[in-house]
């Protein structure tokens, strides 16, 4: 389905966008356009891969004109551009609105105008029952693409989304932070050891995107099932892998943190389709005439439950270590650390 097609990746220099790019470089895709504001990272990618399929566009999703320029002749869009740090969004919520909500509106408007075939919008577990500015902005982003999907024909532009949990070892995540502190001999700072988080690899996340490209219908949110761990057990697993004795320091929760993350709300779980390794949350396609819905009701919601990092499979320390060792980043860091200790 990707042969001789043009794919645009917004936020293409980030961890997620970069992983998607690498996946499609091995396909028969015609061209991959990397759209981001970071010219240094674009130059790094250009030099690293030296691949004629890669085309680079400097711009910001906040600027509709730069988006429109990059969108010409595009067949597929993977929209990953966002602000990703919860505390930063708490202190600058309007910036989160500009990038995550308005930026998504700009991408979708341009995609519709350019007759793009399919758009995948990247969301996060923080969008389900959100309590922080990043999660609220992502939840609104989901509302934007679902609303857009209601108002256009899927034969013209199919718009859907993916919602993922914590991507292990992605830029700005806790695993690189813990490893840096282990190497520096510093205490591992933990906000709350009993917090749970979903654990997905970048490869898992890319598989979710490919699954959405192949199977999602307009307005859908696709979710991949994932195990979780407590933050305390994750720190312990890394210390055991590195055979380190760093102290663990409890510093208390940061701005906007939740005890557990939710991938599906109770209301979504009642309506979702179980696809084996994935859930498909269909769009609420009702119009504003609720008379029939009020008469018939929906008893499924009262019998449903949310799918969160507390009630999925919670990994043991040994299972976490096995999962960590599947990550090339962790293996490389571990080898370097052991070599330095000889």
Please place each PLM-identified region on the residue numbering.
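Strand-loop microenvironment adjacent to phosphate/nucleotide-handling motifs in alpha/beta enzyme folds
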Residues: 143, 147-342
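Hydrophobic/aromatic anchor residues within beta-strands of the central parallel beta-sheet
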Residues: 56, 96, 159-162
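Conserved residues in the N-terminal Rossmann fold of short-chain dehydrogenase/reductase
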Residues: 36, 58, 98, 192, ...
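Conserved Rossmann-fold NAD(P)-dependent oxidoreductase catalytic core, especially the SDR/UDP-sugar
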Residues: 79, 83-139, 143
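Conserved Rossmann-fold cofactor-binding substructure of NAD(P)-dependent oxidoreductases
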Residues: 55-76
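Conserved glycine-rich Rossmann-like NAD(P)H-binding loop of the short-chain dehydrogenase/reductase
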Residues: 29-41
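Rossmann-fold scaffold of SDR-type NAD(P)-dependent oxidoreductases
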Residues: 10, 71-80, 121
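N-terminal Rossmann NAD(P)H-binding glycine-rich loop of SDR-like oxidoreductase domains
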Residues: 5-27
